[in-house]
C-alpha cells in the first residue's frame, strides 16, 4: 500500500532477545521485496559518556535523522531500542518523529535461559552476570508496562527469518 503517513515499527525487548538481529532481518526482507524503509538503532542516537539522557539527545537526534529520511521520501521507519515499547517512550519518540505517525509496537520476548545463552555469546568477563540480571529485570518491567496493544512476539527456538516475517505481517508492510 502506498502511504503518505509516516509509519513506525518500534521493536523493543530485553538485552539478548534479538532486537538488532531481527531489525536487520526485517530490513533485508523488506529490501528484497522493494518496500522503502529505514532502520534506526536507537542506542546509537545517544551512546556517549557521560550519558546525555537528561538532555533528550536520542529524541533530538531522531528528529534530525528522520527529517533527512523524510525529505528523501521515506515514510516507514524500523526503530530498535530496549524501552521503545513503553508508553512514555512511545510518546517521546512519536513527538520526535512528528507527523502523527502510525505506530506498530512489538515487544520481543525470550526465556531467561535463552537470554543468558545469547548474552554469553557477546559479553565477556565479569560483567556477564550483571548484564543477565539487568536483562531479566528489564524483561519483567517491559512485560508489565508495555501497552496491551503492543504485540508480544516470542523469539525462543525460532529462526530470525520467521520472526521478521511475522513482524512485517503485523506492520502490514508488503510490496506495493
Language model region names:
Residues 57-100:
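Glycine-rich phosphate-binding loop used to anchor ATP phosphates in small-molecule kinases
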Residues 19:
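Conserved lysine of the Walker
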Residues 1-6:
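Phosphate-binding P-loop
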Residues 99-120, 153:
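Conserved phosphate-donor/acceptor-positioning beta-strand/loop module used by diverse small-molecule
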Residues 124-166, 173-176:
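Small-molecule kinase domains that catalyze NTP-dependent phosphoryl transfer to phosphate-bearing small molecules
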Residues 16:
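Walker A (P-loop) phosphate-binding loop of P-loop NTPases
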Amino acid at each position: 500500500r502506498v502511504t503518505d503517513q509516516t509509519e513506525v515499527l518500534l521493536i523493543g525487548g530485553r538485552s539478548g532477545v534479538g532486537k538488532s538481529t531481527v531489525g536487520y532481518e526485517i530490513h533485508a526482507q523488506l529490501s528484497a521485496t522493494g518496500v522503502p524503509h529505514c532502520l534506526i538503532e536507537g542506542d546509537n542516537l545517544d551512546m556517549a559518556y557521560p550519558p546525555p539522557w537528561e538532555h533528550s539527545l536520542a529524541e533530538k537526534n531522531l528528529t534530525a535523522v528522520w527529517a533527512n529520511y523524510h525529505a528523501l521520501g521515506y515514510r516507514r521507519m524500523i526503530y530498535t531500542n530496549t524501552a521503545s515499547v513503553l508508553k512514555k517512550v512511545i510518546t517521546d519518540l512519536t513527538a520526535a518523529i512528528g507527523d502523527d505517525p502510525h505506530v506498530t509496537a512489538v515487544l520481543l520476548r525470550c526465556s531467561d535461559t535463552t537470554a543468558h545463552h545469547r548474552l554469553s555469546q557477546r559479553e565477556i568477563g565479569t560483567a556477564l552476570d550483571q548484564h543477565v540480571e539487568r536483562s531479566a529485570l528489564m524483561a519483567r518491567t517491559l512485560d508489565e508496562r508495555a501497552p496491551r496493544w503492543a504485540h508480544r512476539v516470542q523469539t525462543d527456538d525460532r529462526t530470525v527469518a520467521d520472526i521478521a516475517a511475522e513482524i512485517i505481517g503485523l506492520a502490514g508492510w508488503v510490496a506495493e
